[in-house]
């Protein structure tokens, strides 16, 4: 699908110079003299290199067509995470560095959305919120409630987040996977 330069947004995947690029930053500029343009900072998905490119407003780029499929998380080893398509029972593996820190939020049978580009898994999208158990946290001291204070907590998956003072070890909480922040207690 063709996109004009003014339609390019952060997070989009575009095909440019025979490579697949993820848009990191975009700024639309209308100088006093000359035509408007979009200054776009992109990162190559395959080569892990960055590129700053200037597109005139009249130029168009090709938006990458991604196929999105729901998968269930199965397990992990030292190198990969393993997922299964619940319809076909097909299993795939994805390198841990592809998912990054959010991989710690994966729990058995968690439904995720995997985007494919030319039948190659590209991104893994977790649900916006997941349920976790607080493994350890400090005891809240009386008198600390004058301001909205948070205390550090370690979850059962090893992730460290900030939680309100009333949260104790063993409590089940909901965590936002986009920001890795506490949402609410269950």
From Swiss-Prot:
A Pfam family reported for this protein in Swiss-Prot or TrEMBL: EFP
UniProt keyword annotation of Cytoplasm present: yes
Major site of localization recorded for this protein: cytoplasm
SUPFAM superfamilies (UniProt xref): Nucleic acid-binding proteins (SSF50249), Translation proteins SH3-like domain (SSF50104)
Pathway named in the protein's UniProt entry: Protein biosynthesis; polypeptide chain elongation
Gene3D superfamilies, per database record: 2.30.30.30, Nucleic acid-binding proteins
An MF annotation (GO) of this entry: translation elongation factor activity
Gene Ontology process terms (BP): peptide biosynthetic process
InterPro entries for the chain: Elong-fact-P_C (IPR015365), NA-bd_OB-fold (IPR012340), Rib_uL2_dom2 (IPR014722), Transl_elong_fac_P/YeiP (IPR020599), Transl_elong_KOW-like (IPR013185), Transl_elong_P/YeiP_cen (IPR001059), Transl_elong_P/YeiP_CS (IPR013852), Transl_elongation_fac_P (IPR011768)
Function: Involved in peptide bond synthesis. Stimulates efficient translation and peptide-bond synthesis on native or reconstituted 70S ribosomes in vitro. Probably functions indirectly by altering the affinity of the ribosome for aminoacyl-tRNA, thus increasing their reactivity as acceptors for peptidyl transferase.
Family: Belongs to the elongation factor P family.
PANTHER family in the cross-refs: ELONGATION FACTOR P, TRANSLATION ELONGATION FACTOR KOW-LIKE DOMAIN-CONTAINING PROTEIN
Name of protein: Elongation factor P
Originating organism: Pelagibacter ubique (strain HTCC1062)
């Amino acid at each position: 699908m063709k996109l004009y330069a003014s339609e390019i947004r952060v997070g989009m995947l575009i095909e440019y110079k025979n490579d697949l690029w993820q848009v990191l930053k975009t700024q639309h500029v209308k100088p006093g003299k000359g035509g408007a343009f979009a200054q776009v900072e992109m990162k190559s998905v395959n080569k892990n290199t960055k590129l700053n490119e200037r597109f005139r407003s009249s130029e168009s780029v090709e938006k990458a067509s991604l196929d999105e499929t729901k998968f269930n998380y199965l397990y992990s080893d030292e190198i990969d995470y393993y997922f299964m398509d619940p319809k076909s029972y097909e299993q795939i593996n994805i390198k841990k560095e592809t998912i990054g820190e959010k991989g710690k939020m994966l729990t058995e049978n968690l439904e995720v959305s995997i985007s494919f580009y030319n039948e190659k898994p590209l991104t893994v999208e977790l649900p916006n919120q997941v349920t976790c158990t607080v493994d350890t946290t400090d005891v809240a001291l009386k008198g600390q409630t004058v301001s909205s204070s948070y205390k550090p907590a370690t979850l059962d998956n090893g992730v460290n987040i900030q939680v309100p003072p009333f949260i104790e070890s063993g409590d089940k909480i909901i965590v936002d996977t986009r920001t890795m922040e506490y949402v609410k207690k269950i």
